[in-house]
Each structure stands twice: as structure tokens, then as C-alpha cells.
Amino acid sequence: MAYTTEVKKELISKFKVHDADTGSPEVQIALLTHRITYLTEHVKVHKKDHHSRRGLLILVGKRRKLLNYVKNKDVNRYRDIISTLGLRR
């Protein structure tokens, strides 16, 4: 599934903390996870696309930093995000 506006709105509505929330760490992690899964499938098909592979690694690093931030702030929120998104850890 491509990264369309509808998908983005759906993810924001699912992970938002309050009504006008678009930038909380939970929302950012959910959006990054969707982009990461999309790029992972792309890189599996196009093995020599190193530019996209680099972008994928950058996104994974951003998500890791956000997850560490949430983990340091509130462990319960961290566990909820991990279980909801199906991430390892």
C-alpha cells in the first residue's frame, strides 16, 4: 500500500493522543513504520537501488531515536506502541 493521504490520516487517527495531534512521538513512529515497511518491500524487489536503501536506513534510525525517547519518558507508552505496531523488542 502506497503512502497516500488517506493512509496517513488513518494512521494519525489511530495513534493520536488528543484531537489535534499530528506530531506526537506515537504518530511519528507509526508513520515511519509504514514508510519503512513500504521501502523494505521496494528494496527486496530492487536490490541495486542503493539510494532507497540509504533512505530506509535513515528512517530506521529516526524511528529508533523516537522509540528511545518514548522509552525514556514512559515505558508503558513504549510497550503499547511496540505491541500495536508489531515491532520486535
Curated annotation (Swiss-Prot):
Pfam families: Ribosomal_S15. GO terms for molecular function: rRNA binding; structural constituent of ribosome. InterPro entries: Ribosomal_uS15, Ribosomal_uS15_bac-type, uS15_NS1_RNA-bd_sf. One of its GO terms (cellular component) is cytosolic small ribosomal subunit. Keywords: Ribonucleoprotein, Ribosomal protein, RNA-binding, rRNA-binding. GO terms for biological process: translation. PROSITE patterns: RIBOSOMAL_S15. It comes from the Bacteria. Belongs to the universal ribosomal protein uS15 family. One of the primary rRNA binding proteins, it binds directly to 16S rRNA where it helps nucleate assembly of the platform of the 30S subunit by binding and bridging several RNA helices of the 16S rRNA. Forms an intersubunit bridge (bridge B4) with the 23S rRNA of the 50S subunit in the ribosome. Part of the 30S ribosomal subunit. Forms a bridge to the 50S subunit in the 70S ribosome, contacting the 23S rRNA. PANTHER family: RIBOSOMAL PROTEIN S15, BACTERIAL AND ORGANELLAR (PTHR23321), SMALL RIBOSOMAL SUBUNIT PROTEIN US15M (PTHR23321:SF26). This is Small ribosomal subunit protein uS15. The lineage of its organism: Bacteria, Pseudomonadati, Thermodesulfobacteriota, Desulfobacteria, Desulfobacterales.
